[in-house]
Structure formats: structure tokens, C-alpha cells
């Protein structure tokens, strides 16, 4: 049975799917003590296709990037569920790190990453407010528009 957080997400139309398997020599998450570190998740949707591909500011809009960041956050939540079995075990979202595939003059990375941050707050309320870093990068795996990683305090 889905926990309270997962039910809240479902009411908002968010359904968690099986998390993606790592594509190289790493694991999807590591738990140490009461912290869960989730590896970077690109913006792959439930159909296995990228939500947005290419560079922000050179063909990908802020709105498309925002939706991609939200997709990354959904993938983070899927990894958390795989790690813990229940999203209700998240005590708080500690930090998100976002990577935005950006044209050299693209300056709106923080607006893009709000897609991920907004979903965390929608899911966890005040426990979803977090520290965050947004970095514009020259490229991401599979030419994904956005990748997001996270650190979570868990019980």
C-alpha cells in the first residue's frame, strides 16, 4: 500500500515508476547513517524517453527545462522508494544539485531547477525545502537537458 507522501503525489498526477538502472560503474543510491545520497537522475519519463533533449537557450525553453527538472525529481523519488520502500521515511530533503545542459549565454538555470524544487515542496511540505546548487554544463549523458542529484535525511 502506498504511504501518505505517495498518495499525495498520486493526487497530483505523479505516479512513480521503476527507477532507472545505472548506466556505468555506480549505484543509484547509497545510505550511510540517516542520510540517503541519490545519484544524478536525468529527465527520462515513464516511457523511457527524454522529457527534453538538448541545450537550454539553444532550442530548449525554460518551460521545457522546468518540466524536465520535475521529471528528474520524480526519478529521484523513485530511487528513494527503491532504497527505503516508503517515501514517508524521508525526514527532510537536505540538498538538490542540478545540472543544466546550457548554451554559453544561458543564465536561467535556477528557474529550470525550480521544477525539481517545487515538486519536493509539493510532496513533503516544509520538509521539502532544501539547499540547492544549479550549474550550467556543456553536455549531459544522452544529451539530456537536465540532471538532478539529491541528499535526503531518512529514518
Predicted segments with their positions:
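Short, polar/acidic, helix-capping and beta-turn segments at strand->helix junctions
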Residues: 1-155
Amino acid at each position: 500500500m502506498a504511504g501518505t507522501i505517495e498518495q499525495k503525489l498520486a493526487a497530483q498526477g505523479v505516479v512513480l515508476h521503476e527507477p532507472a538502472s545505472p548506466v556505468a560503474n555506480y549505484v543509484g543510491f547509497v545510505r550511510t547513517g540517516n542520510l540517503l545520497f541519490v545519484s544524478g537522475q536525468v529527465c527520462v519519463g515513464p516511457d523511457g524517453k527524454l522529457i527534453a533533449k538538448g541545450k537550454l537557450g539553444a532550442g530548449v525553453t525554460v518551460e521545457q527545462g522546468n518540466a524536465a527538472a520535475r521529471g528528474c525529481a520524480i526519478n529521484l523519488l523513485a530511487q528513494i522508494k527503491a532504497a527505503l520502500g516508503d517515501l514517508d521515511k524521508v525526514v527532510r530533503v537536505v540538498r538538490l544539485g542540478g545540472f543544466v545542459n546550457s548554451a554559453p549565454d544561458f543564465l536561467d538555470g535556477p528557474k529550470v531547477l525550480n521544477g525539481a524544487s517545487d515538486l519536493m515542496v509539493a510532496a513533503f511540505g516544509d520538509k521539502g525545502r532544501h539547499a540547492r546548487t544549479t550549474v550550467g554544463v556543456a553536455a549531459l549523458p544522452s544529451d539530456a537537458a537536465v540532471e538532478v542529484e539529491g541528499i535526503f535525511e531518512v529514518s
